[in-house]
Amino acid sequence: MSFCSFFGGEVFQNHFEPGVYVCAKCSYELFSSHSKYAHSSPWPAFTETIHPDSVTKCPEKNRPEALKVSCGKCGNGLGHEFLNDGPKRGQSRFUIFSSSLKFVPKGKEAAASQGH
């Protein structure tokens, strides 16, 4: 398990429906279901963000392989990016708290962005 504290309630850990994961606070697009994959950690795992500015990154003290990630729009804390720990060589693993995400099913993206 990762060094993050596990709080439980990770509703998106085994959630693999097509769609987009957005920030729970501001609805900014963060991750596509295409980048989500099964991982042994208790948190949802993604390989990449939707936009280059979907998240902001801050080095994790005493952990050169980890970066704290926050929403690139509102600064809401999301979790961590673990460098070179993705499913393929050279990919990152974004380990994200379900409580920081909302899921928008495929085909409803426009309605979700208009509602914000």
Curated annotation (Swiss-Prot):
Pfam families xrefs: SelR
Q: What class of enzyme is it?
A: oxidoreductase
In its record, the post-translational modification comment is:
Truncated MSRB1/SEPX1 proteins produced by failed UGA/Sec decoding are ubiquitinated by the CRL2(FEM1C) E3 ubiquitin-protein ligase complex.
Question: Which residues are catalytic?
Answer: 95
Q: A cellular component term (GO) from this record?
A: nucleus
Where is it localised? Cytoplasm; Nucleus; Cytoplasm, Cytoskeleton
Where is each MsrB domain found? 1-106
Identify the EC number(s). 1.8.4.12, 1.8.4.14
Predominant subcellular localization, coarse grouping: cytoplasm
Q: Name one GO biological process term.
A: protein repair
Q: Which InterPro entries match?
A: Met_Sox_Rdtase_MsrB_dom, MsrB_Met_sulfoxide_reductase, Mss4-like_sf
MF (Gene Ontology): actin binding; L-methionine-(R)-S-oxide reductase activity; peptide-methionine (R)-S-oxide reductase activity; zinc ion binding
Sequence similarity: Belongs to the MsrB Met sulfoxide reductase family.
General function of this protein: Methionine-sulfoxide reductase that specifically reduces methionine (R)-sulfoxide back to methionine. While in many cases, methionine oxidation is the result of random oxidation following oxidative stress, methionine oxidation is also a post-translational modification that takes place on specific residue. Acts as a regulator of actin assembly by reducing methionine (R)-sulfoxide mediated by MICALs (MICAL1, MICAL2 or MICAL3) on actin, thereby promoting filament repolymerization. Plays a role in innate immunity by reducing oxidized actin, leading to actin repolymerization in macrophages.
Enumerate the PANTHER family for this protein.
Answer: METHIONINE-R-SULFOXIDE REDUCTASE B1
In its UniProt entry, what is this protein called?
Methionine-R-sulfoxide reductase B1
Its source organism is: Mus musculus
Which gene holds the coding sequence for this protein?
A: Msrb1
